[in-house]
């Protein structure tokens, strides 16, 4: 997190910060640290991925729901019942950090630009360390690691971002 203060300064007047990276790369930890410095609200894609096969759906939800210009929000995913949960309303005026696999995509960048200044960040970490972190956080992820990694791989070439870390 050597660059945290530099990035926080760049994000201070941003309406939207998008933080992407593969599972276990440190997105949630970085977002929390950045939010402490900027006061931005943090939205976690983990709260609304629709099941283990839902990466593409969640990516669309960022642009259409989370970054909606007048009625932003998202539908939580209930991981215990594998069903949609309650709707969460967001304040359209509040600056936010959106973090998770798939946060940076063409549609989310376009939607974020309509809100004002956007800063995009991608975190990198080697696969072995990422897997160890992810499974330490949630041992049940072991059964789904390959399914999720395949969706990450299928995203193909990544868009350029303002900051590449790792």
Positions of the model-derived regions?
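P-loop (Walker A) phosphate-binding loop of NTP-binding proteins
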Residues: 22
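Conserved lysine of the Walker
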Residues: 27
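Hydrophobic anchor at the beta1->P-loop junction of P-loop NTPases
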Residues: 19
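Hydrophobic positions on the alpha1 helix immediately C-terminal to the Walker A/P-loop
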Residues: 30
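Conserved nucleotide-sensing/catalytic segment adjacent to the nucleotide-binding pocket
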Residues: 41, 47-100
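Small-molecule kinase domains that catalyze NTP-dependent phosphoryl transfer to phosphate-bearing small molecules
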Residues: 136-166
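ATP-dependent NMP and nucleoside kinases share a basic, alpha-helical "lid"
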Residues: 87-137
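Extreme N-terminal, non-catalytic leader segments
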Residues: 1-16
